Amino acid sequence: MAAAFLPSILVPLVGLIFPAFSMALFFLYSQKDDIA
């Protein structure tokens, strides 16, 4: 059963890495933004 350990990988990935990546991407986007 390969799907047994899949939630233990997907939950930290979606819960920790994706928010951190989106926060960093939004931070870099707001830093290079020169509309204001």
From Swiss-Prot:
One of its GO terms (cellular component) is chloroplast thylakoid membrane. Signal peptide: none annotated. Keywords: Chloroplast, Membrane, Photosynthesis, Photosystem I, Plastid, Thylakoid, Transmembrane, Transmembrane helix. Its main location: plastid. The keyword rRNA-binding does not apply. May help in the organization of the PsaL subunit. HAMAP family: PSI_PsaI. The chain crosses the membrane at residues 10-30. One of its GO terms (biological process) is photosynthesis. This is Photosystem I reaction center subunit VIII. InterPro entries: PSI_PsaI, PSI_PsaI_sf. The gene is psaI. It is a single-pass membrane protein. It is found in: Plastid, Chloroplast thylakoid membrane. It comes from the Eukaryota. SUPFAM superfamilies: Subunit VIII of photosystem I reaction centre, PsaI (SSF81540). Belongs to the PsaI family.
